Regions:
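Short coil/turn linking the two alpha-helices of tandem helical-hairpin repeats
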Residues: 17-21, 72-75, 89-92, 119, ...
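Structural register within alpha-helical repeat arrays
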Residues: 11-16, 30, 47, 67, ...
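Terminal, low-structured helical/coil segments at or just beyond the last alpha-helical repeat
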Residues: 147-194
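Solenoid-like repeat scaffolds
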Residues: 1-3, 31-40, 66-74, 103-108
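Generic helix N-cap/helix-start motif at coil->alpha-helix transitions
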Residues: 1-13, 24-27, 36-46, 75-81, ...
């Protein structure tokens, strides 16, 4: 009977969210039933989480798109965009992941998680055949990691780890010296969608 009681379903979702149990089958069932009865941004996001757990990433994107059409506050909007960007990254669609992470930053420019995600997307970009230029994406990725820790100190540890990981792949000074498109110390614009 409670599967048709929107108030009970909402209470269940609220309780499980407060307890940090949004990965439980009970939470998913409540979100799915609530979404069927009376769709809200919260129920759509709950259904998206269920899809992610089942690795139904296309379904998760669709539910996040629904959530975004119903959301009534900027904080949740930015969070849904961030989560949707993560889904695109899980799908290895880094270009779309970066685009959605940028949309999240347009809503909340202080969310360091989005800059970390942008950096990961850029580091995963395959935009050059040239082996030296292909590594130029790591410069931009590390710029994003630095930006993450500059705007959001809670991201500092993750940002520092990512910088340490990806900076080791920068083109060497010798590579830069011998490459006609690069000059040490000069600005360089990474092409493609990055």
């Amino acid at each position: 009977e409670s599967v048709n009681d929107i108030e009970k379903l909402g209470s269940i979702m609220k309780l499980y969210r407060r307890l940090g149990c949004t990965e439980s089958d009970v939470y998913f069932a409540a979100a799915e039933n609530a979404h069927k009865l009376q769709p809200t941004s919260e129920s759509a996001a709950g259904c998206a989480q269920m899809c992610i757990k089942k690795e139904d990433y296309a379904g998760a994107v669709e539910y996040y798109k629904q959530a975004l059409t119903m959301v009534d506050n900027e904080e949740d909007k930015a969070d849904y965009l961030y989560r949707m960007a993560n889904v695109y990254v899980a799908m290895k669609n880094y270009q779309q992941g970066a685009a959605v992470a940028q949309q999240a930053l347009d809503v909340n420019a202080e969310d360091g998680r989005c800059y970390l995600l942008l950096g990961i997307c850029y580091a995963s970009a395959k935009i050059y055949d040239d082996p030296i230029l292909a590594r130029s994406v790591f410069w931009v990725a590390c710029d994003m990691f630095r930006k993450a820790k500059a705007v959001d100190s809670s991201c500092s540890s993750d940002a520092n780890k990512l910088i340490a990981t990806y900076s080791q792949y920068f083109p060497s000074k010798e590579d830069v010296f011998f490459h006609r498109d690069l000059n040490e110390g000069a600005p360089y614009r990474v092409g493609g969608w990055v």
